Swiss-Prot record:
One of its GO terms (cellular component) is TRAPPIII protein complex. Pfam families: Ig_TPPC8_C, TRAPPC-Trs85. Disruption phenotype: RNAi-mediated knockdown reduces the abundance of collagen in the cuticle. This is Trafficking protein particle complex subunit 8. The gene is trpp-8. It comes from Caenorhabditis elegans.
Length: 1282
């Protein structure tokens, strides 16, 4: 309907009978009927070059009695809002909005657009006196030239404006003859037409005959455009009339009710309260015309359409075009050619005019219709309307200069706008570099600054036209910025349209984020203007641009507004509702507690509204509550219980370590040749979950998982249970009654703000079920009185693969099958383990720790055999306890698969393999003793060995098995230190030096008594059967006790055993009743201070001791332990055989920081302190003199640094290159030094950079020892970490 170049405006005045013909044929008015046929080709002569050109012109013909320009402040806003409400698609609504704005806006005083150029009079052959009707209509037209006249003008329209005086306005006369009319007569038709031609001239009179009497298929959809406009106009007028009635309705006290309209327009209504709600206010208008044109069929044929086109074509050729050519020629001669004195004078006003520029701008300037400026403007407008944009551009360009000189800025802005429109229409091929861009920059700003609010149609039209030109030139960003200027005017619906168009231009410019931002602004404005459908559409278009940007506030705003506006407009879809709920769930934890309560209620209400008939639980509440997938544990069967699972088990023992011990227990129960099947009872993120594990039928398959409330408000969950899929039964038919396992439910769970709770749910598979998989968590989220069924998928991710190049470049994970299970049809044995006695969590080195367990068969299967497997093969003993408290030791056997794993079979002298070890309901007691490690926790010389693993496995008669396991780990402290010294090689005399390492301040009493000394050999280190042939005899049998920080020495000698003698131990006391554990001696030397090539001594001397300790709080503790030292004579023999002194010094290197940050810009030198610990363990008991030396990279003088490779240059040096010190026997030297470093890198602060030269007493030969390598990372940073 609208176009860049306005259409010539033609007035239509008709008689009552002619309007009835239109109504009877299903049209609102005659202008409604002829609207589709107003475009025509014609020849127009250009006044400047006097050349004719063929132009296609579309006439805008309006019935003055029913159609016109709407009142700007009181009617037009409501019609524009109705145009926006017509469609739910924002682009289609804005297109209609622009059409309505262009057609209905009042004409501006600065232009001639919207002024009627000619008038068409229509009478019918049914009129009693058609010529008299013509006379009345001519008089009515003359009356309309009076601006105060309201004759024929509808109450919602402004007074019509005319381009020429009444006498000069061209008139055309049409006789309407409807053949359907019963009074129609061809004779009367011809007679009346002849009278008209005689009175008004043959060229000014025509006859329009309509012959159709039914609806034509050829004409279907021809009037859709004008019908849509009329529908919008009717609804807008009804709303405006309603508002006008409400505004003057008397209140309770007789005062009028000044209620503001729904749109933000704050103007005072000027529409008459007596105006009809719809249609025309002409006295001749049909009261039911609005109903007729909406409901009736349109009776018009193609012949009728051609007849109308012929009438209008003749009107153009003989009436309008000659008048326009004459008018353009007159205006061009009068004002268009005056380019000298007048323009020069006006251009000099800025130099010679009185007053300041500010005062001139403050006074609005208007021009008379016959002034030279308005004559130029009329000429330019006619040239543009009738297809001569080049000539129009020249006129507009000269005019805008004069108006700018006159400081008529509003008129100047309008002329500048049309200057751009004319130039673009004349030369559409111009690009951005060729077009006069400066013309586009200021019109909108000038109109906003200098035009009044009632001129908002001019501001909008200017902004739209300038933006269209910018867009055609490819300057989409500039087009968007130009439209954004409209935000400063009043009227939310007006600003919303401009913001939406600006968003489209930003999107075309590739500025997606700005486009979405402006769509959000537009949506807010549409919402304020009570247009929820378009508000929803703008929010919907903005939604994808903010996806996964983690902009919490914006995500929350978009989601809430979409749900609200979609509900108001009734246009919400389930897909968008799901996306909104997903975003609200994601952003809800970032909000304040009050907002979280409101948003949680919004989520539940949205789920209840948009998903009321769902068959499956919704899967949108993935984070409320949050399921901590890394905490998922699957427990296959009734044991172990949740409180028996060690959470830190993976930190102490690796998966391979557990498999080794499990395999040893399996072979001990089933034989060394039986294939290992595994017996994993608990699967978590640290276990091997690539295989599907077995779970017994008739027992619970339990799933433990942590649920976290991410909100700052409590949430209430009901009926929590697991979701199970992929169920298979023995018959292979899914869905049968037998294949559906029972699901355990947690009736109610409340999570306090930001609280994490561990829950345990289960699946109870029955016999006949072969396989199933847990795939989700089901629950009901309750808010107020509503609850919604929700489901959170449970899918565990395996460990990341990082072996091949492809796996390193892309994230590939192993399969995790911990939530899948196959069901074992045979029952598993089930034993309850109750820990009766267990030691303290911390212990002393070499202390004996006893664990007592009560075992009870609570299952439905007899336990045929049971065994204990441990990786501490040299530090564990096991046995059973009978009813009389008698302890029976079990025999230790090394595992078939690993010589460093020990197994103990729990047997009680049964003679038959069919005897059960533990019958159903039977109870027994067992124990196992563990000797603590010989080095304290955190010692620099402590071994890198695994913790003690205890695994008890048992099996039933049908071959199924189960296990119970523990990791013995705790803090260790040193209680006693032992060293051996050879006194006489011939008599094999030696001394044992004892020291109580507990400080006086650490305990009120610390007394250690030596009970026994024995010799032993470990067969695991040598492979030789334990048949040590010597025993140890103390020189004096005396009671040896040492208290805190005390020392003592025991002198003893090794004596060969006589033939048949087996006693290899000597007791120093006869009063003790202690039964020592029967564990083997240590298998190897544990200290890392030994050289890696040092020999391992299998022969040991064991010292059994008893300690009584009273700590500072008064707690009394008594326990035993056994410490082992190497046989000094075997050790000396081994060293002499190897002829090596490399084990005489024990060296360790430590640094205070493995990683240090230093600002090399502030200080070029970074200092890194290190500590060297050197222990003299020379077997020949000799003092030693050591020298610590720095090994320089550059050892010879060079002529320049450039001759040395960068990797060989000095980058680190030490504060003292040479350090010397003498170390006595068994003493330890502590040397502190500082490295100085110049570059950020990874440095070896020991290793090849330092060497130790040792000279032992009595020898002149120097022995070189190496310093262990210690890596330290020095990073460059803007700050220094001290």
């Amino acid at each position: 309907m609208s176009s860049v170049s306005p259409s010539p405006l033609i007035a239509l005045i008709s008689s009552e009978c002619s309007q009835k013909h239109a109504h009877n044929r299903g049209f609102k008015s005659l202008s409604h009927f002829i609207f589709p046929f107003t475009s025509h080709e014609c020849q127009v002569r250009e006044p400047i070059d006097n050349l004719k050109a063929s132009q296609r012109i579309r006439l805008d013909i309006r019935d003055i009695s029913s159609d016109g320009h709407l009142l700007t402040l009181s009617v037009l806003p409501y019609v524009l809002i109705q145009a926006l409400k017509t469609c739910t698609d924002v682009s289609q609504s804005i297109k209609l909005f622009r059409d309505v704005l262009a057609r209905c806006s009042e004409p501006s005083e600065h232009e001639s657009f919207g002024h009627y150029l000619a008038c068409i009079f229509v009478v019918s052959t049914e009129d009693e006196n058609p010529l008299g009707e013509f006379s009345k209509m001519i008089q009515t037209q003359q009356t309309l030239y009076n601006t105060t006249s309201t004759l024929m003008i509808p109450g919602h329209c402004s007074t019509p404006k005319w381009a020429a005086p009444h006498a000069k306005t061209p008139r055309h006369y049409i006789l309407l003859h409807d053949s359907r009319s019963p009074r129609s007569s061809t004779e009367r038709r011809d007679e009346l037409l002849a009278q008209m031609c005689a009175t008004y001239g043959n060229d000014n009179c025509q006859m329009l005959q309509l012959d159709s009497d039914s609806e034509s298929a050829e004409m279907k959809g021809v009037w859709d455009e004008i019908d849509e406009f009329n529908d919008v106009l009717e609804k807008g007028l009804e709303e405006a009339h309603q508002h006008s009635t409400d505004a003057i309705a008397p209140g309770p006290n007789g005062a009028s009710n000044q209620q503001s309209p729904s749109s933000p327009t704050s103007s005072v209504a000027t529409i008459s309260s007596t105006m009809p709600a719809v249609g025309s206010v002409s006295p001749n208008s049909h009261p039911n015309s609005t109903v007729v044109w909406k409901s009736s069929k349109k009776l018009a044929s193609l012949a009728d359409a051609k007849a109308v086109q012929a009438i209008l074509s003749k009107f153009l050729d003989v009436c309008l075009i000659p008048y326009v050519e004459k008018e353009m020629r007159f205006l061009y001669e009068t004002a268009g050619q005056k380019k000298g004195i007048g323009k020069s004078f006006t251009s000099m006003k800025r130099w010679f005019g009185s007053g300041t520029a500010l005062s001139n701008m403050a006074t609005p300037i208007t021009y008379a219709w016959d002034s030279s400026e308005m004559q130029t403007r009329r000429l330019a407008d006619l040239l543009l309307m009738f297809g001569f944009p080049n000539s129009a551009f020249e006129q507009y360009r000269g005019l805008k200069r004069d108006l700018e000189a006159d400081k008529a800025m509003a008129a100047h802005a309008v002329a500048l706008e049309m200057c751009c429109v004319a130039l673009h229409s004349a030369q559409p091929q111009l690009n951005a570099n060729q077009f006069m861009i400066k013309y586009l920059e200021t019109p909108v700003s000038l109109l906003i600054e200098h035009a009044k609010f009632r001129r908002y149609p001019s501001i909008l039209r200017c902004a739209f036209n300038i933006a269209d030109i910018y867009s055609d030139l490819g300057l989409h960003k500039e087009a968007a910025l130009n439209l954004a200027k409209v935000s400063s005017i009043e009227g939310d619906h007006l600003v919303a349209v401009a913001q939406t168009l600006a968003a489209e231009q930003f999107e075309k410019a590739g500025m997606g984020r700005k486009a979405s931002f402006h769509r959000v602004l537009a949506a807010n404005r549409f919402s304020n203007a009570a247009i929820p459908a378009l508000s929803f559409d703008c929010y919907r278009l903005a939604l994808p641009a903010f996806d996964k940007k983690h902009w919490g506030v914006l995500d929350e705003h978009l989601a809430v507004r979409l749900l609200e506006e979609g509900q108001k407009a009734g246009v919400m879809t389930t897909d968008i509702a799901s996306e909104c709920i997903r975003r609200l769930v994601a952003v809800c934890p970032k909000l304040s507690p009050s907002l979280q309560t409101e948003r949680l209620r919004t989520i539940v209400n949205a789920l209840d509204i948009y998903f009321p008939h769902r068959n499956e639980p919704v899967e949108m509440l993935t984070d409320i509550p949050k399921v901590e997938m890394e905490t998922v544990k699957a427990i296959y069967g009734e044991r172990p219980l949740w409180n028996e699972i060690d959470e830190n088990e993976h930190q102490s023992v690796s998966s391979d370590g557990w498999i080794t011990v499990e395999r040893a227990a399996h072979h001990a129960l089933f034989g060394a040749s039986a294939p290992y099947r595994g017996m994993q009872l608990v699967s978590d993120e640290h276990s091997d979950n690539q295989k599907i594990r077995e779970t017994p039928a008739g027992e619970r398959f339990r799933v433990m998982v942590d649920l976290t409330n991410p909100l700052k408000i409590p949430i209430h969950l009901q009926n929590l249970r697991l979701s199970v899929s992929d169920i298979h039964n023995q018959s292979g038919i899914e869905g049968s009654e037998k294949s559906i396992p029972e699901l355990g439910a947690l009736e109610h769970l409340q999570l306090d703000p930001e609280e994490t709770k561990t829950i345990e749910l289960y699946v109870f598979p029955r016999v006949g079920c072969l396989k199933f998989r847990v795939d989700g968590l089901l629950f009901q989220l309750a808010v107020d009185q509503k609850d919604v069924e929700a489901r959170v998928p449970l899918k565990c991710r395996g460990k990341r693969l990082n072996k091949t190049a492809k796996q390193q470049k892309s994230k590939i994970y192993t399969n995790d099958e911990r939530l899948s299970a196959t069901v074992a049809q045979k029952p598993w044995p089930l034993v309850e383990f109750r820990v009766i006695k267990s030691p303290h969590q911390w212990s002393y080195c070499d202390q004996a720790q006893r664990y007592q367990l009560e075992i009870e068969n609570i299952g439905h299967e007899n336990v045929m055999s049971m065994c204990l497997a441990t990786n501490a093969f040299d530090r564990v003993a096991a046995g059973s306890i009978d009813e009389n408290e008698h302890h029976q030791q079990f025999k230790m056997n090394l595992a078939a698969n690993n010589a460093k794993v020990a197994t103990f079979r729990f047997e009680e002298g049964s003679t038959s393999s069919t005897d059960s070890f533990l019958k159903i309901g039977e109870k027994k007691r067992i124990f196992f003793d563990v000797r603590s490690s010989d080095e304290p926790t955190g010692s620099t010389v402590a071994p890198k060995q695994s913790n003690t693993v205890i695994l008890i496995a048992y099996r039933s008669s049908n071959g199924t098995m189960r296990q119970w396991r523990r990791v013995i780990d705790g803090e260790r402290r040193r209680l006693i230190a032992l060293t051996a010294e050879i006194l006489d090689l011939d008599t094999k005399s030696f001394s044992i030096h004892l020291k109580n390492c507990v400080a006086v301040s650490q305990a009120a009493l610390s007394r250690v008594e030596i009970l026994r000394i024995r010799t032993d050999r470990n067969e695991a280190s040598t492979g030789i059967k334990n048949d040590c042939s010597t025993t140890v005899l103390p020189s004096v049998n005396r009671r040896v006790e040492i208290e805190s920080e005390q020392t003592d020495t025991i002198v003893a000698r090794l004596v060969p055993l006589s033939q048949g003698e087996t006693i290899k131990e000597s007791w120093l006391t006869t009063t003790t009743s202690v039964t020592p554990p029967k564990w083997p001696c240590p298998a190897e030397i544990h200290s890392t201070m030994d050289d890696e090539f040092a020999s391992k001594i299998a022969e040991k001397i064991g010292i059994l001791w008893k300690a009584n300790i009273v700590n500072n709080e008064g707690l009394v503790t008594s326990f035993i332990g056994e410490s082992f030292i190497d046989d000094p004579f075997v050790k000396l023999k081994t060293l002499k055989k190897d002829d090596s002194v490399l084990s005489s010094l024990r060296i360790s290197c430590e640094t205070t920081a493995k990683e240090i940050s230093h600002n090399f810009s502030a200080s070029h030198i970074c200092e890194l302190p290190i500590t060297l610990l050197i222990q003299n363990k020379d077997l020949q008991r000799r003092p030693v003199s050591v020298s610590i030396k720095l090994s320089s990279k550059v050892r010879e003088p060079v002529d320049g640094i450039h001759l040395v490779a960068p990797e060989n240059r000095h980058q680190m040096w030490i504060d003292r290159p040479v350090r010397k010190q003498t170390i006595g026997i068994d003493d330890e030297a502590k040397l502190e030094m500082k490295w100085k470093i110049t570059h950020a890198a990874v440095y070896d602060v020991g290793g090849a950079n330092l060497s130790i030269e040792a000279i032992f007493e009595g020898s002149n030969d120097a022995v070189i020892f190496k310093v262990p390598s210690v890596l330290s990372v020095v990073k460059s940073s803007s700050y220094t970490v001290v």
